[in-house]
């Protein structure tokens, strides 16, 4: 978590360990990880991967192309998987939505899973909401409320 001010809050949400990005590799090894930054993270991801570790690529916001040492991955006996909803057929998207309804929403309803909300805005203030979304330092969702 980039912002030290958010570490306690992230820990209270259930994180086993909270580290700064620059400490990520040294704080490993990790059994698994979700990758959503992309190319700049790859050298550290492989270095911090535990033996038999897994990486699931779900985003490439900072770039999709990288160089990867297959020998390093082989020595870790690691696994890389990748997925995106965008290119899936409508039926698969519907299945994913139904799985959320079955498995995740009951946890939200029971209070076992919470989603941090940074700020709420009425729909009429959508531009201000987008501006807040574009700012750094958030911990949580920016929510537009329809009246």
Language model segments and positions:
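A short acidic, often aromatic-flanked loop/helix-cap motif at beta-alpha or helix-coil junctions
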Residues: 23-26, 88-90, 122-123
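C-terminal capping/lid region of NAD(P)-dependent oxidoreductase domains
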Residues: 105, 110-119, 127-147
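Glycine-rich phosphate-binding loop and adjacent beta-alpha segment
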Residues: 10, 40-112, 145-147
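Structural signal for short hydrophobic segments within the conserved structured cores
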Residues: 16-19, 115-121
